[in-house]
Amino acid sequence: YDLWRQSGNTGWGWDDVLPYFIKSENQERGESKFHGVNGPLSVSDQRIHLPLLDEFQNAAEEFGIPKTKDFNTGDNHGCGYFQVTEKDGFRCSTAVGYLNPIKNRKNLKILTNSHVKKINFENKTAKEVEYWEGNELKKVQANREIIISLGSIGSPQILQVSGIGNSEKLKNLGIDMVQNLNGVGENLHDHLMLR
């Protein structure tokens, strides 16, 4: 997060986003400097512990990789069991935690069987979203902002087809550039996980 802030994204450093993480959590371990207990996302320890994974942690420690019980303290280097967003054995996704409680609001429309095609810009400001609803291409205007939340693959893909990304790559694909932004769609790192 601090690298985001150092890149000019004011408000996106670790200290800036931590209060929002705390606000989002309902942490089963209880409230702490890094965790909240009143949020919509239930966070819990994994219920399974395997001897092989315990030994893996011991081996990692012998190579100088510290054991950690909490990867959400701002220093996520180490080896250990990660926590999960689940409650009573069921996944507590953003849809379950945030969307389900408000899905009947009059000012919210949930589209299913729809697929975003691209975002249209006006003077580098996102103005509308083009999307497919079934076989029909539709557009919706933004009154204030457009939030892209399509995961580590979908978000950069939509940015790129909308003209945000490496200018050479966009040009080779025949996409008109809105913003030359190297790094979009590159350098994906997944979380290393053993089970």
Model-derived segments and spans:
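Positions in alpha-helical segments
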Residues: 2-3, 157
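Conserved redox-cofactor binding core of oxidoreductases
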Residues: 3-126, 131-132, 191, 195
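Glycine-rich loop(s) and the adjacent beta-strand/alpha-helix scaffold that form part
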Residues: 119-122, 126-195
